[in-house]
């Protein structure tokens, strides 16, 4: 019995850091949204093919606009989303990263991802980022500008989908942009197919494409050009599919980019190296990796990250998440066969973590100070918009992919979701998710040390 008690005490002591991480309160201070079906016209010099997007999301080409209803997929209940594709124009959907530095007018630079989720189904999805301005007084979001990525100087080192065109606009068959930073009048984008860092001019022209290096070796994924199929996971490539730079933070003072992979690296045999994510630092001035790398440990139940941004010289915010979607209050009963009105995989882990990047342990792990729970947000003043809140209990943000976070001021942060149009819901069964922007009052989180 004494041995068992001693062993239990030892195990408890070893597990205390994970269990003792402080959970800080969050209060809703503002709520706004961009409607799910928000489209933008391609530039006048874009190929005609790009005026209809989503033609290749099914097994065969489909050129009939709005003819196939979006669906969240069998695992998530098989719910239709009420929005059909192909689209006439390009969907603004998929907010996948905020730049820390805002535009001169105070609007936010926000990135749209590769389009429809994969290299194969997104050759007609244009790549772009925007200036977005949420108005929490009216509950609306204004798209003030869209910048389209293009490669006029042939900087991309492989054949692009629009190789034979004069305008050379980039598409989701070329890159999967997931993180964004603004520095010295240009932009840096972290993407997932390489994974690569893209240096981009203010007008969207590609200036450079830089491969990833960890411990001196180039990292590749299954979608990296040059990786031959069949390829062995952990040997021929180490980065998981959709596991590239979901988060890339710009460090004030040093201007270093801290690039964080979305998912754990693969090892020989196809398994992962652990419940942690790699973080590498890159010097934009030298256009080279510094050689330093760190580890971010995921909490129990988390499978990936959504965004990563500094709030001062050493402290940063990271969104960590599970693969769930929808409020737990609407979860399907265990063993349910009828999932038409419930969520089979409800959201359970949606956190924003505060990191101390100046505190690193002997194994290279960055110190987690604490987090807020996006499934438990107080709303005492009723800021939540009608139809976008639970019937009872606290306000929640129960989306599959929450991919935007940035510091607004000393007490507030801005958070937004990637709505994966037209393939994700989360608020209401059978309805596509909007692009929601929430302003959160989190003074305790932002001041914690």
Provide a role label for each language-model segment:
Residues 21-449:
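Sequence/structural signature of beta-propeller domains
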